[in-house]
Amino acid sequence: MNDLIEDFLHFLIVERGLSANTIKAYERDLHYFVSYMDVTKELTDPNTLERSDIVGFMAFARQEGKSPRSVARYIASLRSFFHYLMHDGKMSHDPMIQIETPKQAQGLPKVLNLDDVEKLLSSSDTSTPLGLRDQAMMEILYATGLRVTELVSLKMDDLHLHMGFIQTIGKGDKERIIPLGKTATTVLEKYLEEARPKLRRPKYRNDFVFLNHHGQGLTRQGFWKILKGIAKESGIEKPITPHTLRHSFATHLLENGADLRSVQELLGHADISTTQIYTHVTKLRLKDVYKQFHPRA
């Protein structure tokens, strides 16, 4: 089975162009399933799999405390894997027939109000090169709605500041062009002129925009650590994740009259239904404003 999994992962890289993080997620999910099957029965041929094996695996995952979201992801990964095997002639039947994906409550994105955004964007120590970098990253995230992976993957050639935009490669290797406002442009230019040259190291000749203190490109994990420090410094009590500024970017655009299709394009969503979740957020926020300020609310 491990050889078949490797073939599948290679297919996802070459034919589907999926990101390294997505490939790792598939790999973890499939090996988790195989480790379960190794205990229940020796699995050398996928054609011996039955629906009962999948049902048993789902029950096992729940017993181990896996969330409905995780179980749903396992099922999606297995479904894709088995479809690949059947299409490739390595599997004659689909054991996923009549397997339902666990229902999961869809939580609304956590969004900052404008005051909290201002606190977050002004909480970096801009007297240091690292502080200038951190401020620039926060400004870019809120100004563009980039995913964190897209942010840390930015190269110098992706910046077109004289024209007021940046370009990025998002999910599915889709390129998109995103406008950059004056404030974010000014902060980014200051970082590029005053801080980035001090962070560069001769032995690392890379062109990533955002560098760590070793002169290497910043990682997602590195950014998460930075964000936790900034969030603590800001004094904001709400939980803040790497996606918080992206959620706030989308919600504030819609609140100020942007149309849904434009926001979808800026976020890089393949399906507009993904973007529509933010309309629910704006409705709830309007309801809160009404309750707070209407004399008869």
Curated annotation (Swiss-Prot):
GO terms for cellular component: cytoplasm; Holliday junction resolvase complex. Pfam families: Phage_int_SAM_1, Phage_integrase. One of its GO terms (molecular function) is tyrosine-based site-specific recombinase activity. The active site is at residues 147, 171, 243, 246, 269, 278. The keyword DNA-binding applies. Site-specific tyrosine recombinase, which acts by catalyzing the cutting and rejoining of the recombining DNA molecules. The XerC-XerD complex is essential to convert dimers of the bacterial chromosome into monomers to permit their segregation at cell division. It also contributes to the segregational stability of plasmids. This is Tyrosine recombinase XerD. It comes from Listeria monocytogenes serovar 1/2a (strain ATCC BAA-679 / EGD-e).
